[in-house]
């Protein structure tokens, strides 16, 4: 409860606006991410074990992380990201999607089983989550519909998730089921716990101030990988972007933002994989082509590269703070089940276009219906399955570490995917790796 919804809204609005104005790749959307949440949770537990105040420790870890991140930016360390290939990018992207899905399903189950929620509230929570997911997915697919005008289909596809939240919340308000868990926000512009906005940096002993540099090194690895891998996914050739990337500038901006956010104990922001890819897709012109087997395949023709949408999104997020007190007095609070449905939507839809996920589907697909992709045509199926199995093993290890007491060193295990990929050169031919991992 020390860092809540209000802190996340403020951090996202301020950080996202600054990033949209100053970054080298404004199509990337900043936000809180699953791996960063895991790291913060483990840092909280570590502070409890050492009997240290969490907010002061959080601030110092953030400040040290900012220093290390800025050093990475000014020394050109982002060039090291060239050693990351599609192998690492895809495993990381699927991990983020699974975190969204597992958090949505797990929290929804906890809500349904909560003793303070009666059977009507449990049933309504389940219905609201499913309805939010279904509406968002349905509206997202209207872009390919034959009905309505083009601009209407485009609007519904781009704002489908917002419409889904509003519709499901309206139903919850209309039914007025008491005891339904809702998003906790203050009645006024204030922190969730009522603490001062500015953190007391000197509430720590000297040894802890310098000791915070150790977890900050791990956090820096996470920020570096999380942000740069997402930027690579945004800049991938399939998106046909015309303007060049700005890895060093982007990392510098994130480092400076981390320092500022840490002073107020606001959530650290990095490139949000799911939101960034959805942002690119919303700005893309997409065409469908018919494959020889009769199936269809989508491909991006162009993307409207600009700063306006990212800037507008975060300004509107900031303005939403002004309406929160009024909405709360009117009883128009967002049920948590609606947000779980949104998380499920974000996790499921972000799997689209991920070749690792598409190759996993081949395991349960009739061989006669395999898609005619380049790797299916050029690589023996046995080797495709072997490559996919290695990626799956890496994903499973990352998940186990995330759920274990080793979660604080979780960033190092993500980094180990890079040498793992280079070790595959001994087991696969170069042309096979070119097809599977180019």
Question: What is each PLM-predicted segment?
Answer:
Residues 1-438:
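Transmembrane helical cores of multi-pass ion-transport proteins
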């Amino acid at each position: 409860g020390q860092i809540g919804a209000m802190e996340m809204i403020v951090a996202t609005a301020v950080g996202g606006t600054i990033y949209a104005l100053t970054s080298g790749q404004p199509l990337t959307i900043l936000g809180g991410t699953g791996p960063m949440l895991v790291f913060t949770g483990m840092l909280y537990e570590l502070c409890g074990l050492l009997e240290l105040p969490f907010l002061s420790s959080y601030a110092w870890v953030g400040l040290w992380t900012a220093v290390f991140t800025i050093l990475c930016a000014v020394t050109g360390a982002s060039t090291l990201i060239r050693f990351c290939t599609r192998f690492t990018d895809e495993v990381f992207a699927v991990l983020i999607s699974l975190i969204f899905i597992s958090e949505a399903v797990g929290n929804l189950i906890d809500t349904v089983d909560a003793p303070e929620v009666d059977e009507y509230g449990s049933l309504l929570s389940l219905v609201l989550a499913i309805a939010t997911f279904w509406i968002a997915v349905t509206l997202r697919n209207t872009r390919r519909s034959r009905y309505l005008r083009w601009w209407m289909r485009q609007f519904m596809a781009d704002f489908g998730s917002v419409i889904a939240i509003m519709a499901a919340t309206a139903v919850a308000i209309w039914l007025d089921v008491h005891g339904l868990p809702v998003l906790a926000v203050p009645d006024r512009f204030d922190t969730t716990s009522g603490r001062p906005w500015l953190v007391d940096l000197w509430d720590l002993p000297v040894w802890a101030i310098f000791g915070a540099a150790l977890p900050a090194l791990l956090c820096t690895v996470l920020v570096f990988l999380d942000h740069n891998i997402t930027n690579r996914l945004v800049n991938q050739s399939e998106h046909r972007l015309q303007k060049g990337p700005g890895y060093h500038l982007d990392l510098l901006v994130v480092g400076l933002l981390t320092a500022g956010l840490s002073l107020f104990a606001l959530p650290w922001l990095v490139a949000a994989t799911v939101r960034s890819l959805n942002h690119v897709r919303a700005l893309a012109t997409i065409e469908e082509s018919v494959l020889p087997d009769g199936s269809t395949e989508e491909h991006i023709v162009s993307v409207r590269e600009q700063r306006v949408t990212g800037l507008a999104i975060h300004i509107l997020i900031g303005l939403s703070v002004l309406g929160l007190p009024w909405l709360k007095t009117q009883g128009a609070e967002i049920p948590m089940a609606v947000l779980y449905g949104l998380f499920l939507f974000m996790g499921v839809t972000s799997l689209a276009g991920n070749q690792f996920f598409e190759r996993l589907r081949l395991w349960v697909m009739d061989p006669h219906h395999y898609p005619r992709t380049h790797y299916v045509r050029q690589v023996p199926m046995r080797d495709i399955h072997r490559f996919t199995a290695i990626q799956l093993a890496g994903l499973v290890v990352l998940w186990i570490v995330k759920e274990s007491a080793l979660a604080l060193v979780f960033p190092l295990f993500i980094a180990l995917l890079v040498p793992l990929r280079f070790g595959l050169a001994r087991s696969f031919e170069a042309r096979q790796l070119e097809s599977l991992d180019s």
